[in-house]
Amino acid sequence: VGEASRNIKNQMGGWTITWQGRGNSNSDFPRTLSIYEAIKNKVESIGGTVEYSNNGSYKTKPDVVIFVYGEEPYAEGDGDRKNLFFINNDKNFLSYMQNIKSLNIETVSLFLSGRPLIVNHELNLSDAFVQLWLPGTAVEGVADVIFTKKDNKIDHDFSGRLSFSWPRTSDQKVLNFGNMPYDPLFAYGYGLSYTDDVFVSKLSEENKFTQPNEITVFLGSAYPSYHEVVSYF
């Protein structure tokens, strides 16, 4: 479910052919599969069937529904944000997910973005959630990890881990690994494999950003300098 599964530009991101990357069409990537095509090829190769829908409707009740969604391509400027809440361009997308969930059909979310965002609503409605980032031209790898072999043996296990912390709230000020108090939603290095058995409690769905009353930008004396400043990476 989701136009993002069929629009290759969404898996490529900004600075792809064009600056923002939004005006690209699938024909601009002649040797690249869309996420939908990669999933369809994988499922059919092991004897299954796939049906596409842009709103969650179906002809035959599915065993599982895969939702593909995320940010539109962006670069600097157009991609700047005032907060970290994910806003789907399809305003009805959450209702599609809620409807499928109410039918007791298992749901998988494949999320496309170039940065961590607050997706608590979507996480609560997902039996499995995979952060794809921007997979580019190699979306066959997505299908490789989310499906097992026909005999249910693992084909390719998940090995990706978060390279930075995933925020718990949009106004979370302390988020860097090693800083205290350190309490992200998903910590630096977090990631699951098929052998993990993890239950994530229902998350807060309040889309509220709290402006701080006061921010200390600088405190102390700037002159004279008593020490040499050395950049450390």
What positions do the PLM features span?
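C-terminal non-catalytic regions of proteins with extracellular/luminal or membrane-system context
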Residues: V1-F233
